Amino acid sequence: MTDPVYRRVVIKLSGEYLAGQQGFGIDQPTVDRVADDLIAARHLGTEVAVVIGGGNIVRGVEVSSRGVSRPTGDTMGMLATMMNCLALEAAIERKGTPARTLSAFVMPEISELFTRTAAHKYLAEGRIVLLGGGTGNPFFTTDTTAVLRAAEIGAQAVLKATNVDGVYSADPKKDPTATRFDRLTHSQAIEGGYKVMDATAFALARETSLPIIVFSIAEPGSIGAILRGIGHGTIVAG
C-alpha cells in the first residue's frame, strides 16, 4: 500500500452532502458512506480531523435574509454543524473506530470544548476528530473554520470535498466550455473569484502556507486516493 502523502489533514465536508438525495436533514446511508471513507483514510496512517458545514439543517445567511439578525442566524448554523458532527461521530464509532467531537462552544453535556491540546491528544491516539461549531463567531464560514483549525493543529493540508472534481473556470454544470485547473496559487484563487471556497479561507491559507486540495467526494474511496497522491482534483498552494 502506498504511504499517505500527508501525516495530518483537515477534511472539509459540506452539510448539504450529508442530506443525500433528500436534500434536507441527515441521510443515514450517506453518513455511513462518509464514515467508511474517513475510517479508510485513518487506516492509511493519516491523522484525520473533520470540519462539517450545517447547510443541510440551516444556513445562517438564508435565515438572516428572512428577518433574523445575522449573528443569530450564524449561531443557528453553527449549532447545526454540531448535529452533523454528532451524527458522523456515532456512525464512525458504530463501525469500531474511535472518534471525538470538539466544539467551538462551551456545551459540556454534549461535547468537549475545542483546544489545540485536546485535538493533538485525540489525533495522536488515533481518533477521528470532528470539529463542530464553526469558529464560534458569526460572519465566518466553515471553509474558513477548516483552514483556521488546520493552522492551529499543524495539519499539512486542507482537503475540500465537493460535488465537482476540482476548481473550474466556470460552473461545469452550466458551462460546457469550463476547464478544470490542476493547480492554482492562493492568490489566483482569490483573484479569480472561484466560488469553491470563500476569499477569507483562501487568504488565511495563503498567510499560513496551507495547501488546499479541492476534489469530488462522490466516488467512494476518493479521500484515500487524495491521501495517496493518486486522486483527481485541484491543488491550491503557493
UniProtKB/Swiss-Prot annotation:
Allosterically activated by GTP. Inhibited by UTP. Its EC number is 2.7.4.22. ATP binds at K12, L13, S14, G15, G55, R59, T162, N163, Y168, D171. One of its GO terms (cellular component) is cytosol. GO terms for biological process: 'de novo' CTP biosynthetic process; UDP biosynthetic process. It is an enzyme of class 2 (transferase). GO terms for molecular function: ATP binding; UMP kinase activity. The keyword Nucleotide-binding applies. It is found in: Cytoplasm. The keyword Transferase applies. Pfam families: AA_kinase. Pathway: Pyrimidine metabolism; CTP biosynthesis via de novo pathway; UDP from UMP (UMPK route): step 1/1. UMP binds at G54, D74, T135, G136, N137, P138, F139, F140, T141, T142. Keywords: Allosteric enzyme, ATP-binding, Cytoplasm, Kinase, Nucleotide-binding, Pyrimidine biosynthesis, Transferase. It catalyses: UMP + ATP = UDP + ADP. InterPro entries: AceGlu_kinase-like_sf, Asp/Glu/Uridylate_kinase, Uridylate_kinase, Uridylate_kinase_bac. Residues 20-25 are annotated as: Involved in allosteric activation by GTP. HAMAP family: PyrH_B. Homohexamer. Catalyzes the reversible phosphorylation of UMP to UDP. Belongs to the UMP kinase family. This is Uridylate kinase. The lineage of its organism: Bacteria, Pseudomonadati, Pseudomonadota, Alphaproteobacteria, Hyphomicrobiales.
